[in-house]
Amino acid sequence: MLKRKQSSRVEAQPVTDFGPDESLSDNADILWINKPWVHSLLRICAIISVISVCMNTPMTFEHYPPLQYVTFTLDTLLMFLYTAEMIAKMHIRGIVKGDSSYVKDRWCVFDGFMVFCLWVSLVLQVFEIADIVDQMSPWGMLRIPRPLIMIRAFRIYFRFELPRTRITNILKRSGEQIWSVSIFLLFFLLLYGILGVQMFGTFTYHCVVNDTKPGNVTWNSLAIPDTHCSPELEEGYQCPPGFKCMDLEDLGLSRQELGYSGFNEIGTSIFTVYEAASQEGWVFLMYRAIDSFPRWRSYFYFITLIFFLAWLVKNVFIAVIIETFAEIRVQFQQMWGSRSSTTSTATTQMFHEDAAGGWQLVAVDVNKPQGRAPACLQKMMRSSVFHMFILSMVTVDVIVAASNYYKGENFRRQYDEFYLAEVAFTVLFDLEALLKIWCLGFTGYISSSLHKFELLLVIGTTLHVYPDLYHSQFTYFQVLRVVRLIKISPALEDFVYKIFGPGKKLGSLVVFTASLLIVMSAISLQMFCFVEELDRFTTFPRAFMSMFQILTQEGWVDVMDQTLNAVGHMWAPVVAIYFILYHLFATLILLSLFVAVILDNLELDEDLKKLKQLKQSEANADTKEKLPLRLRIFEKFPNRPQMVKISKLPSDFTVPKIRESFMKQFIDRQQQDTCCLLRSLPTTSSSSCDHSKRSAIEDNKYIDQKLRKSVFSIRARNLLEKETAVTKILRACTRQRMLSGSFEGQPAKERSILSVQHHIRQERRSLRHGSNSQRISRGKSLETLTQDHSNTVRYRNAQREDSEIKMIQEKKEQAEMKRKVQEEELRENHPYFDKPLFIVGREHRFRNFCRVVVRARFNASKTDPVTGAVKNTKYHQLYDLLGLVTYLDWVMIIVTICSCISMMFESPFRRVMHAPTLQIAEYVFVIFMSIELNLKIMADGLFFTPTAVIRDFGGVMDIFIYLVSLIFLCWMPQNVPAESGAQLLMVLRCLRPLRIFKLVPQMRKVVRELFSGFKEIFLVSILLLTLMLVFASFGVQLFAGKLAKCNDPNIIRREDCNGIFRINVSVSKNLNLKLRPGEKKPGFWVPRVWANPRNFNFDNVGNAMLALFEVLSLKGWVEVRDVIIHRVGPIHGIYIHVFVFLGCMIGLTLFVGVVIANFNENKGTALLTVDQRRWEDLKSRLKIAQPLHLPPRPDNDGFRAKMYDITQHPFFKRTIALLVLAQSVLLSVKWDVEDPVTVPLATMSVVFTFIFVLEVTMKIIAMSPAGFWQSRRNRYDLLVTSLGVVWVVLHFALLNAYTYMMGACVIVFRFFSICGKHVTLKMLLLTVVVSMYKSFFIIVGMFLLLLCYAFAGVVLFGTVKYGENINRHANFSSAGKAITVLFRIVTGEDWNKIMHDCMVQPPFCTPDEFTYWATDCGNYAGALMYFCSFYVIIAYIMLNLLVAIIVENFSLFYSTEEDQLLSYNDLRHFQIIWNMVDDKREGVIPTFRVKFLLRLLRGRLEVDLDKDKLLFKHMCYEMERLHNGGDVTFHDVLSMLSYRSVDIRKSLQLEELLAREQLEYTIEEEVAKQTIRMWLKKCLKRIRAKQQQSCSIIHSLRESQQQELSRFLNPPSIETTQPSEDTNANSQDNSMQPETSSQQQLLSPTLSDRGGSRQDAADAGKPQRKFGQWRLPSAPKPISHSVSSVNLRFGGRTTMKSVVCKMNPMTDAASCGSEVKKWWTRQLTVESDESGDDLLDI
């Protein structure tokens, strides 16, 4: 998938300039600068410089004063070194003069700038040491550029052997694509920013105590927690008694104190929208909006914002990065290297018997030096028993380490049983390593990378068992033993190797990420280290943690908000832009790079893809052969076929045993034969056939089959001979024409892609048919012998591929036949086979009735009685939807939906058991499902029938859901205790929405796509679990019992942790109020408790795994980090950072990569080669292309024509786009009736509205109303402008809040039209729209899963008490609220905290033994399973499917002019030509006009009639054949051109290739026949002319008799088809046409030539002349010069019968040619707008 965009050009150019580090010149004066050690020293100095600048902060010097002098010394040294290097380079290169002077080299300028920054930093530090400049002054910001010197350290690794032009092109294209998507993102940010301003405005109304006075707002004035409210009584939240709703801005709070997030004006609004789109803190914004404004506004705004911005638009960003960097990665393949094999080149492989008795390939190094161990030990060491013993010991060691737990404070930790076990295992693995070294020798042992890893573990674990180092950082070596277990599973080992590929690729990305983090941390450090009240950037470790936190997105908004508050109001916008740009780059581009690399590693090599396609086809054929196991079970029973029973014969006669099926076949055959025999007799045929069981049509079919069998062998021989002969004649003609040099006089011209592909096909077929004569092209000598040989080999390979394809096709047919035969045999030999429930007969009336009911479906597709083609009706999409499933399934879908709606009204306080109204839907569902299942079982059987109800997982699920519903309905328990069987039954009942998955075929497909790739997802899960286990074991050994602390921060020791203390309460996260003198924050007294953190601990492996699973989702890891640093030590912060980096960068991107790869594999795109993938993209792109909805320019040069020119001018379009943007800017502040600024803004909007009215009027005048209405965009503009006019009238009449709201709505609707005016925006919007359309069923599937979990959540957690995150907004008290909470969890917003709130257990809650709705306790095990499974399924798998679909659809629009297939320019050119031909804008043209269309095409689609006559004939005949001379659509012609423009051998897949080749062979044969027929007619003409010349004397003698006979005789005509009476009647008209050359007759239909016209509908049943069958005209008659004006009109569809051409053919052709030329020029000037805005009309 990712390699399909690589450029096909190979440039042989010198490698790129490496920058200033290469050798400057051989005769340089200063030689030391060229030494390699100097380059290495300078690179090390660059790293030292970064370290120095990271230490250079006031806080660091305060903690470690000597560092001030250390940094000064280092900087002085570096300054001298780099200055010397700069002077030396200037001396060698020259400063300004010369091509390679110092100033002209970019790298040299960069190095010089770094030296300048170093000087500035040093001078500044001198002033700081001398106390002339304060260390906390902003002058320190001058050091900001210094960390960029890190680039010098890694510049050496950017040496790539690629031509400079190639790199420039790649970077240019990448930049263009990223810029385009940035514009797209900006469009949506602007849209939602405007909507936010107008829908919400400010969030400044809060609940405050009644006695609050202006200027005296403190923490104690606010509600706890701080609550937003609405001043309007009907909407939002109303404050409780004792509080009033007040605007805090009116009470004197500044903007800085109120916080920066909100929708006050457009700038703040865009900032807030970006924060929400990062899915961090968006839900709290929504809750504020719900409290302040009407509820529906908040839900609509924020849910659509998350869906479009966070999921769709941002994923388009990921798609762009994957696509643009795909080409870079392909070019850098030389630098990264390809995946080599697992064994080294020095090793060979041999078969070895494994433990299970099978054989496996084992690498054996023949050159490996043998150790000194005895042979028996060497044999033992190589045995599989020894290997499995060691792995089993590793497993036991891992289990023992995982069993460790915290045993209490008083337990002696040094020498417990776990320590002794660790010592024993360490000794065992030390002995294993010594044995291997003894057997292999140290050199042989160390040569394997696996042995190096084992030796590292042995040394580390040996040091670890030393008592002082036990429970230290050396524990890593112990827990890393688990990695050795990957060797147990070969599948897992291969998968790991495939994903991580060559270490260079992923390793270079990790190094790049780490370097970026260090550089950005150092920059931020120097930017903010002097800011007071900001402790996040005081030292380098703190700065690094903050920037890393932004990279992972967890709490990044808090980092930004704290910094904004600290820097003050003036610098806040600059700081916000800095953090947003860093966040954008880190989260989108950097993470996308990891996904792209993993996808590239999962990509198959090109040469393997076609092989895999063939193998897959073979495998499919093999699987189709076998019947399912449930049917094969009948083969175990003895055969008991049904015998003939004759009831009326006496017992004296013995009836032979004859199978009933044989007797039936015999009787049927006899009746058929008798009927057919009697039919041939003259008299009795009708009477005898009346008594026959078969109809006349069936008899005809039977005779037809008999005849076909009889002539089959003769026909097969004749067909082959005929095809070979015709092809040989055609190829010989082509070669003769090429050799005769018929094209000598014409200038050389670049051939079109159609011509190139046509000649490729000709060459291929000529070789395939065994034509061995030499092919000599014009102007070239004979081919050399080697080239001939390579051609022969190539075409032999093609022949072999052909035979493979045919073999697979035959195999498929045989498998299908075999399967049918097996089924028929079982049906015949086993009387109970295919009998539902072993009771209902196979052909029983009741079963047939059930079948009719079950399989009845809506079918509105009408077929043409003549052609058999399906006609598209007006509402065919609606009809297709109705025909999607059967009527019975539609009924069940409706019943299931109604039942789910009824379940939505259930809650713990309104239960189905006690609410009769809710039971109605329950009864209806069970009754309808009973009827449905009974009908289906009677029609198709339950289990042991071919089409049984239970034949897959869906059937099992149906029966399960039915049984659960039935049991619940019968039982209907009145009291349901918590955690009981009845509650479990209620939870299982919540699976009811999953029925829709089974009923809708597309939903089943989604599930299939999900589960067919389950193996890879399972392997990724194992890898992540292994990673978690390693870190969990380490965490238990280091942090068990150490995280517990007293809740009073002033108490350090456990024995002092008693009594009570006052704890402060957190009031608000958003407000930044400062405490007044003497004021205390609100708080209350609580007892002191020594306890673990609330949400996590590392006291045992289970709890540690849960904590790390939450961290893996990047939620809550900041709290874990802070607790570990605060309670164990700062050095242990490395632990959680390493885990998050591995989990976030590699673990989660692995999930994304694997889900995308599986999606492609299931869709069949993973195995597609580059060419096949491009072809699929092209087909999808052409599907959504439409004809230009642009009417033609008016004929004359009058007023309308001038208007047309003005409205179509690019300047006019850009002006209108700017006016739309200008009007949208008017919505930068909220339009409020009470605000005085609203009136002038509305007045300006009125002016803009009148301008747009003028624009629409001009367009209507220019295009005419009918022409204007053709374009959907014009219709949309007209609608918006009409609404604008209505608004202007209402605004001046009423002038109230509603008119202002309507005005804002009109402007927002107008803002949408920007997308249509910008090509890139339109393309990307189409990507999103097409992705939404294609992912519709995935989104529906997500919603159904959400619904199931919501219903279950109401049952399990409906009454849980409020906690940290379960509150009045987020709870499970009803299905609606549960859906909102689950949608929040999908975005990952604090899902782990909600889970812990739902785990609450006594004594922190009130239990109840009898009913679950009377308790406010949670369910620990239920919450664990519920939330973890939901988060994994939705967030890790389903959302990544959305990414996969968007990545796939984006490739449709990632088209460049370098692409070999049809580009946008080609498509645009075709649209313009189509508009010329389809002058009525109907989207269809008659078949005869296709010739005219093809002749007008230019550029890459041009068909040169002089060189490619045959191709032209093929294309015209293809259109006639496929559409039977009827109308052809825009897409029909485009599809034909696309097939002709590609090499079908490379681009088409198996089935499509076979069908296409068959069609092309047929067309070729038919055209050949027509060509021969026309040639024969010409020969006959010549013969007749000669005969007439030789018989001129006789002719003159009989002239008088001839004149009298001419009125009775028709002129002779040579026809292959029998002419109808109507044709004979019109023969006079036909004979009046003048005789023209054969080329004009076949290939050059002029505008007046009616030869290609369609016949009328009345002639549909009559035999038509095929393409190329031209009647010989009789002797020419005098031609009158009168001509109908209709004939000169291009769009006229007059048939041959209605209009007769009566003018000179040469004059006619010339006049029409000049008219077309004028028309072509006019259309080209008007319609070739450089903006390409109508390329794809939405």
From Swiss-Prot:
High-level lineage: Eukaryota, Metazoa, Chordata, Craniata, Vertebrata
Alphabetical list of Pfam families matching this protein: Ion_trans
Outcome of mutating V1020F: Found in patients with neurodevelopmental disease and hypotonia; uncertain significance
Domain comment quoted from the record: Contains 24 transmembrane helices (TM) that form four homologous functional repeats connected by intracellular linkers. Each of the four internal repeats contains five hydrophobic transmembrane segments (S1, S2, S3, S5, S6) and one positively charged transmembrane segment (S4). S4 segments represent the voltage-sensor. S4 transmembrane segments lack some of the charged residues (K and R) found at every third position in the S4s of the NaV, CaV, and KV channels.
Function of the protein: Voltage-gated ion channel responsible for the resting Na(+) permeability that controls neuronal excitability. NALCN channel functions as a multi-protein complex, which consists at least of NALCN, NALF1, UNC79 and UNC80. NALCN is the voltage-sensing, pore-forming subunit of the NALCN channel complex. NALCN channel complex is constitutively active and conducts monovalent cations but is blocked by physiological concentrations of extracellular divalent cations.
Family per similarity comment: Belongs to the NALCN family.
Extracellular domain ranges by topology: 58-65, 130-137, 200-269, 290-294, 404-416, 469-472, 531-543, 564-569, 907-915, 973-980, 1040-1104, 1125-1129, 1228-1236, 1294-1296, 1358-1378, 1399-1420
GO molecular function: leak channel activity; monoatomic cation channel activity; sodium channel activity; voltage-gated sodium channel activity
Mutagenesis / variant outcome for changing K487Q: Does not exhibited altered current kinetics
Catalytic activity: Na(+)(in) = Na(+)(out)
Superkingdom, natural source: Eukaryota
Description of post-translational modifications: Phosphorylated on tyrosine residues.
Residue positions with a glycan: N210, N216, N1064
Modes of activity regulation: Inhibited by low micromolar concentrations of Gd(3+) and high micromolar concentrations of verapamil. Insensitive to tetrodotoxin (TTX) and potentiated by low external Ca(2+) concentration.
Predominant cellular place of this UniProt entry's protein: membrane
Record has Disulfide bond as a keyword: yes
Transmembrane segments: 37-57, 66-90, 107-129, 138-158, 174-199, 295-322, 383-403, 417-439, 448-468, 473-492, 503-530, 570-599, 887-906, 916-939, 948-972, 981-1003, 1016-1039, 1130-1159, 1211-1227, 1237-1260, 1272-1293, 1297-1318, 1332-1357, 1421-1447
Name of the molecule in the record: Sodium leak channel NALCN
Effect upon mutating E554A: Drastically more sensitive to Ca(2+) block
